[in-house]
């Protein structure tokens, strides 16, 4: 078992204190804890479990259930393609393959330089705007080969998401009242 650096322990204890060491706050605690190192190492899960008085298996189960929580190292750009039936019918598999080829990465892996990881999630909540993906938690819908080419270039340039074309991050509200 690895030992956590004292700065990480201090940050975790701060998060736990803000949530009053309440086990009912586990998901929020994990989300905030992940921001410390960009993922949730085993030692972090153990520390949280002990502090909340929960079995480690329960904490690990919650961390493993949500696709936006990472129990393995991920790239600085974390790309999650939606893998639901709608996105499959709209051709997401070809787009995922195209992005991976352009970034020289295999799906489910982290690039050698740690820049990017690409994988899938069961749903992004955007099947009305698919194919869709999340990049560092930001939704991008209506993917096309042109957009994938440009996204690959933006990632290679290490451009901050706030500087990406605004229309890429624009999600239309298709909910209508009668």
How does the language model describe each region?
Residues 1-178:
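Feature of Fe-S/electron-transfer and energy-metabolism proteins
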